[in-house]
Amino acid sequence: MLLSLRINNFALIDCLEINFGQGLNVLTGETGAGKSILLDAIDLLLGGKAGARVLRQGCSSGVIEGIFSTSTELNDWLATQAIEPLEDNTIACTREFSKKGSSLNSRSRLNGVLVNRQILAELRSQLVEITAQGQTQQLLDPGQQRQLLDLFGGQNLLEKRQAVEITYKEFTQAKQALTARQQSEQNRLQRLDFLTYQLQELTEAELTDGDEWELLIQEQEKLSHVVELQQLSYQATQLLYQSERDTPAIADLLGDAEGQLQTMAEFDSSLNPLLELVQTALTQVIEAGRQVQRYGDNLEADPERLGEVEARLQVLKRICRKYGPSLTEAIAYQEKIQAEYDQLTDGEQSLAQLQESLTKAEQELIKHCGQLTLIRQKTAQKLEKRLVQELKPLAMEKVIFVCQLESSAPSSFGAEQVVFYFSPNTGEKIQPLAATASGGEMSRFLLALKACFSELAPPSQTLIFDEIDVGVSGKVAQAIADKLAQLSQRQQLLCVTHQPLVAALADAHFHVDKVVINENIADPTNPQLDEDLRTVIRITPLQSDGDRQQELAQLTGGHSAKEALAFAQSLLEKSAARRQASQV
């Protein structure tokens, strides 16, 4: 569980300390107030990649520190890394940043012990799971659906899948060996001589990744146009959501439009769908601006690297011309002839022995694939039942979900494809998830999946949601709020939201805002000169009912009118009643 977070000189944060509690922790504030920057900080703390502009402008160093509570399992893992938990059974995770010239350096520590990113990655899986905006799109990938099913099946299924991977590799090797050995002896010797030459050339080229050519071309283009890209990304960021000019950014204009439509919708509810469209557009524009800014932050001129890239491209071009035409085909060709070479050098093994080996390998593969299929079928039934149980309370009472296994040729991942079929409405045929689910339905589907997997995760793990409720309202928003509250009874949740229905159920509520301060240390009372003014992020715990009522009213209608305040008060009263009922 995340107990506290301390941030100094990160992005727009000058100095911040925030304490989190058990249950549902909610962050609210105006669009663009910097709520997601906190999630970026947590991501960086636990090994995320740092961009060139991670430090606050004008600062040469910064730090992010998180204090987490530990569990018996986590303490055992720490012991394997020679790290002792603190006396109060907590762990302090710290990431320090320093800038020297144009380079940014960072160091990570656990309870004062220096650690690498691999250790942080292992720790991250035990401490937090971040559900970012846009993650619903990953659910549409059949490979991701198969992976989710296998993870839900637990250790038994994963071990059987690994056995299939091993036997499939043995099968392909046996097949290649038989084919190679069927050649005549004279051909074998001639072939060996030819393969020796080709393998030497391919080995010297050090081919490892089939995507290297495309990646190098992209890198070459990027390195050749760094200055242009920096300028364009800065301009795009300004246009999208961080304008420093008199002309407002697109996000500002959309925010104004959202405010106008919210007011209009109070008088005409038929405008709510239009309001939702504008809100969705605003969220996407802000996310696009943030990604463009991150892209620009990571750009750096490197002439030496550009020379290395161009030299490497010449080598790969020659290899592809001879063994391709693509690099992937060249690598596959190298693997193929290496296996063929290894078999041709073993002249003692007879054709009959190779045939017998292939037959045994095929039988073994079919056996393991069949066993994996049976486990997946049972797991699919459990996932169907469990996911429907989680979806029904999310305003999807008539939902149908089928995890279908479609037979395919045996491969390294088994003998079936996994496809999620879904029908959210009565009378509608089930269709693949990618063909039928709307944005709001995908958000609920993802939340239901998280609920299913939360039972498999350690209770000490913190679930972080970045606007999981985006694009929904009314009954659906209330259902999502209730589900988040339910999850928070088992695990700590940290949610960024614009939904008053979610915020009302918070066990701890924080308001995020941007403020402008005067940094003229010598004379703070000096007339505010532009160069002394800085924008910083502030976070305020909302501890009184009055403060929370005002915040919920802002989320509801964008102002503190009587109706909004009354609605906010009713939400708080209902939340208190739910909390009291859950404790009985």
UniProtKB/Swiss-Prot annotation:
Protein name per its UniProtKB record: DNA repair protein RecN
Lineage top rank: taxon: Bacteria
Sorted UniProt keywords: ATP-binding, DNA damage, DNA repair, Nucleotide-binding
Sequence similarity: Belongs to the RecN family.
Phylogenetic placement of the source organism: Bacteria, Bacillati, Cyanobacteriota, Cyanophyceae, Synechococcales
Chain's role: May be involved in recombinational repair of damaged DNA.
Binding-site residues for ATP, renumbered to this chain: G29, E30, T31, G32, A33, G34, K35, S36
CDD domains from the UniProt entry: ABC_RecN
Molecular function GO terms recorded: ATP binding
Keyword rRNA processing in record: no
Keyword DNA-binding part of the UniProt annotation: no
Biological processes, Gene Ontology terms: DNA recombination; DNA repair; SOS response
